[in-house]
Swiss-Prot record:
The organism of origin for this protein: Aspergillus niger (strain ATCC MYA-4892 / CBS 513.88 / FGSC A1513)
Taxonomic superkingdom: Eukaryota
Record region (Disordered): 87-111, 175-202
Official protein name in the record: Inclusion body clearance protein iml2
Family note: Belongs to the IML2 family.
Length: 692
């Protein structure tokens, strides 16, 4: 059991110097204003502004700036700097928090009607701990990763305690009859623009210090048990947010706890069980609501919340194929397009010089099947002075070029990634080599000289990849794609030796198409672009491929699985399912396991089958448009009966994928499986009382 009150507000020796509310407010505003400059690509301005102050808010701001750079680029040196700054911020905030609690009765200190004295500094500690935890988990050291989880736990407890203060405030306001002060106001496009708040009636300050001293959080407590009615959802112009310290605490607690709940809800099944054992419980819906609430505020935290929402929606949601059906009027788990577009437009207006928000605009276009526009946005002359943002821009450009089969640009861009970022150089070389392999195959029969040059480059980049694999680690483990790349190239080298052919002729199914599949590029493609992928896949069985007759069931299964994925994206579900049944499920799974084998085929096929079943549902078709053809054309009366069967079968395949023994890329595929199972459970809950 954790005594939150004694930890958060325990009595410690404190300085006799009190914290003046005016100087505290000035420090907060100065620090947040300076730190926000990094989101407009003004790194020097942010660093210079923050160097002028020594307050806990300035220390936190310096930590935030380093943290943003660290998480955008994963560079070890920047992560070390971030860790040092965040440790300093945590220590400073702890001292100020104890001082604020000790001097809480001084006449010149700020007294909030919502939060106990010193809560703003408790939040600073939690933010520093949360960011330190992320840096620790990203670190290559297992020891640092474990320390990161310890910090995460401390931040989790603090944030939960702060949010319980808000719940207590809401309850007291209701009990005293002042319902207007906690009335939920109409939500705008994620930023509260244009809405007017009901003036808050005076509410007596709540003595939460005593309440918190008796509050315990056990390791198995579910902090996410409260619903939307227990959350403050007021807009920034509400009377309860007259003081910027309260704005900072409210927006900060919502952002930090929201991102925690969201991230924990996304982790793969095996890992989520471990997190549950040590007291972490995710809640995607509540987490997203909290992020949207934080994004309303015109400060650094509001912008970070907006970046998180856009990143989740244009990245994770579009990466996953099975997501909850949108809820009319207040959808947060799906893809609320108008709301997201309004949020992005506001951020672009606030930060016109930033390449970061341009990157998000590109991602949004890609997520909405406008890959040409997405690529064009990233091919401009402007460069970010922030190396980490520039690396992200080039990486995103590389992926878009890959989806569009722009092989020359794809290869050039991934080679540029090698220079800009050291995170996964083996993968960058592998995809660059794969792009040149595609160029080689395209012209081998018409221009032997040019084809030979592309073959030479393909071999050069393929052989550069394995020595770089394993250089970077996540929680002391090799990155999933590093393992994949090393095995693939070893497999091709072994085949080249066995078949006595050049390396480029020992490669099987188009590795670019395989990569498009793993990055879920098909969901971003138009019908015409999907047809191009089908054409590229057809090369394997063409006369141009002299080694196809030597291929075994493994490579042929990969070809059919990739074809099935393209067919699903085309909404040709019957064909996709039949292809999976006859080409993969009819095979003994032992044929796909063993040395140098692609052991991911079977579990991924189960996920693909589940995705087809989910997308065939009458509800899905009503929202997204019907499939190109279907052998099952139900009447309205049988829609629900059919949908129940489809969801049941979908869940069966997902559970098989979730329980599959360890395989290559299981962590990556596991993210999709976790999201899918959650979507299915939400559907089951919504339809539990509906007769079928």
């Amino acid at each position: 059991m954790f005594r939150v009150g004694s930890w958060l507000y325990g009595k410690k020796p404190a300085s006799t110097q009190s914290l003046d509310s005016l100087s505290e407010l000035r420090d907060l505003e100065d620090a947040m204003r300076a730190a926000t400059l990094i989101l407009n690509d003004d790194v020097d301005g942010a660093e210079d502004g923050l160097s002028e102050g020594t307050s806990s808010f300035h220390n936190l701001g310096r930590g935030v700036v380093a943290f943003i750079r660290a998480t955008l680029g994963f560079e070890q040196e920047i992560m070390r700097q971030a860790s040092e700054r965040l440790n300093a911020a945590e220590t400073s905030a702890a001292n100020d928090q104890h001082r604020a609690q000790h001097n809480s009765h001084a006449p010149n200190t700020y007294h909030s009607q919502i939060y106990a004295p010193g809560t703003e500094f408790a939040l600073c500690q939690a933010m520093a701990q949360l960011m330190s935890a992320v840096v620790g988990v990203l670190n290559e050291s297992l020891t640092e990763s474990i320390k990161g989880f310890y910090r995460l736990r401390k931040a989790y407890i603090t944030l939960d305690a702060i949010l319980k203060m808000e719940q207590k405030f809401i309850m007291q306001a209701r009990n005293s009859g002042n319902s207007t002060s906690t009335e939920s106001l109409p939500r705008g496009a994620g930023q509260g623009a244009g809405s007017k708040s009901v003036p808050a009636s005076p509410v007596e300050p709540i003595d939460l210090k005593k309440e918190l001293s008796d509050l315990s959080i056990s390791a198995d407590s579910e902090a996410s048990a409260s619903g939307p009615s227990d959350m403050l959802s007021h807009d920034p112009d509400s009377d309860i947010f007259k003081n910027q310290i309260d704005v900072f605490v409210h927006s900060g607690a919502n952002f930090c706890f929201g991102i925690l709940l969201l991230l924990i809800s996304m982790v793969p099944p095996a890992f989520s069980k471990l997190l549950g054992i040590i007291g972490f419980h995710g809640d995607k819906e509540r987490g997203l609501r909290m992020l949207w609430q934080a994004s309303k505020f015109h400060n650094l935290i509001g912008a970070l919340a907006a970046f998180s929402i856009l990143g989740y929606s244009n990245g994770f949601v579009r990466y996953c194929d099975i997501m909850p059906d949108p809820v009319p009027g207040d959808d947060v788990q799906g893809y609320p397009q108008e709301r997201l577009e309004a949020l992005l437009a506001l951020m672009r207006k606030r930060f016109p010089k930033s390449q970061l928000w341009l990157l998000e605009e590109s991602r949004m276009n890609g997520a909405n099947k406008k890959l040409d526009v997405a690529l064009e946005l990233l091919c401009g002359e402007d460069r970010s002075p922030l190396k980490q943002v520039e690396a992200l821009r080039v990486f995103e450009r590389s992926l878009n070029a890959m989806y569009l089969h722009r092989y020359e640009l794809c290869a050039e861009s991934f080679l540029e990634c090698v220079e800009l970022n050291s995170w996964s150089r083996s993968l960058y070389y592998y995809i660059a080599g794969s792009a040149h392999l595609s160029l080689y195959r395209n012209i081998a029969g018409t221009d032997a000289t040019a084809a030979a040059k592309h073959a030479e480059k393909a071999v050069e980049y393929f052989r550069k990849a394995p020595p770089l694999a394993g250089k970077k680690k996540f929680m002391a483990r090799q990155l999933p794609f590093d393992v994949f790349v090393s095995r693939k190239i070893a497999k091709w080298e072994a085949r080249a030796k066995e078949w006595k052919v050049p390396l480029v002729d020992a490669v099987g199914v188009d590795p670019i198409e395989e990569m498009i599949f793993f990055w879920n590029g098909h969901s971003r493609m138009t019908q015409e672009q999907l047809e191009e992928s089908m054409t590229k896949l057809a090369w394997s069985e063409s006369e141009a491929n002299k080694t196809w007759s030597r291929e075994g069931p493994e490579e042929k299964a990969i070809l059919q699985l990739l074809r099935a994925a393209v067919l699903r994206a085309m909404r040709r579900h019957d064909e996709a399912k039949e292809m999976i049944r006859t080409s993969i499920f009819s095979q003994d799974k032992s044929q796909f396991t063993g040395h140098l084998k692609d052991d991911w085929i079977y579990p991924v096929a189960h996920f693909e089958m589940a995705a087809n079943l989910w997308m065939e549902r009458p509800t899905y078709s009503a929202i997204h448009g019907g499939p190109a053809s279907s052998s099952e054309k139900p009447s309205t009366d049988s829609d629900m009966q059919l949908e129940r069967r489809q969801v049941r079968e979908c869940k069966e395949h997902l559970e098989k994928a979730a329980k599959w023994e360890s395989y290559e890329l299981d962590a990556r595929v596991g993210l999709k499986v976790t999201a899918a199972l959650e979507a299915v459970e939400k559907w089951e809950s919504a339809h539990a009382t509906t007769s079928g």
